Amino acid sequence: MDTKPGDAEAKPGKTEDSDFKVTPWEVTGKVDYDKLIKRFGTQRISSAIKRDMEKIADGKLHVMLRRDIFFSHRDLDLVLKDYRDGKGFFLYTGRGPSLGMHIGHLAPFVFTKWLQDVFGVNLYIEITDDEKFMRNSDYTIEQVGEAARQNILDIVAVGFDPDKTFIFKDSEYIKNIYPLVTKIAKKINFSQVRSTFGFDPSTNIGMIFYPAIQIVPTMFENKRCLIPAAIDQDPYWRLQRDLAESLGYYKAAEIHSKFLPPLSGIEGKMSSSTADSAVYLTDPPEIVENKIMKYAFSGGQSTVEEQRRLGANVDVDVPFQWLYYLFDDDDSEVERIRSEYSSGKMLTGEVKKVLAEKLNGFLGEHRRRREKSPEMLDKFMYSGELAKRMWRRIYE
């Protein structure tokens, strides 16, 4: 097993600053990602790592890597070494079910699919229905169950390999993992979860116990686990990295993304609770266009004359940032828009229309694939090659 410096020194998961706050449940303010790397004790993805991944991917690096959307990591270099040495690795990610998935929820799954396609590895997707129920006092068990089903249909539509992907709900699979959950829970004390997650006397005991459940999938195989996720999820894996080797497993490796900003501005991250700041996977084309034209924060000037003269600030312009984040993978086209918009040659309305067209194309393709998701659901959860093996296993 490998021990990397810096794990013990990493700051608590509740990261606050005078300008921004990042926890697994809340992101506010304009995030300084350089400062967050230092606070969390992670590493920036180097050009050398990108070159390695580009070589493995036959020169086709994913847009979210090329543009530093996935920007930080823990032990990604060791994952790549294991892959080159023939040891392999596996992928693990998850979803806390909500009553409506938006594009910010889907983006990490799109990147995860690329990883599975390039490396040909198994993927485990945990649906944390138990955690969602315990954390949200206004959710019933029935609501969480329906949200989980709908979210799984959206995840299936991303196009993962059904024989190398296992999607499971905690509430169903708990009997297969509970022996290992208890071993993990025994190694974590209340002081650790309180300092990591900011729990207080009002926190229910389910939430205090839950981190032990979320750690288990990192131990599904006797290989290194790579977790693609937004950087706000890092605190869970610091706990895992503290205890994994004592149980005979590898420390989890991670690759972290930046947040897709809400329509309202570049501060914080998109939230399902604010309808006008998010674009949902179910939004029809006219609603998508209306949201972008009406609500997307612009870095352009207030009049056409000023825009022609001064240009836009693309660093705070949400339509441009969304194009850059994922929704236009043509680097030369994005740079053309950056140049013409920032110089005043392009107007705000023109950039918004480009985004609306790109985003509606993305969502239209997703909806077409989702129509076939119900017939694939059983294979991902129960009858696919990996799923069948997983239901036969008990983790002790």
Tell what function each PLM region has.
Residues 1-95, 165, 241-293, 299-302, ...:
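Non-catalytic terminal extensions that flank enzyme cores
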Residues 59-132, 227-229:
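N-terminal catalytic cores of NTP/NDP-binding nucleotidyl/phosphoryl-transfer enzymes
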Residues 95-101, 198-202, 225-229, 307-311:
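A short glycine/serine-rich beta->alpha loop
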Residues 102, 155, 232, 267, ...:
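Divalent metal-coordination and catalytic microenvironments
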Residues 120, 219-226, 326-337:
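Short helix-capping/linker segments at secondary-structure and domain boundaries
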Residues 126-139, 260-263:
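Short connector loops at secondary-structure junctions
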Residues 135, 140-257:
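Divalent-metal (Mg2+/Mn2+/Ca2+)-assisted nucleotide/phosphate chemistry catalytic cores
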Residues 171-175, 200-207, 307-317, 346, ...:
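Structural motif
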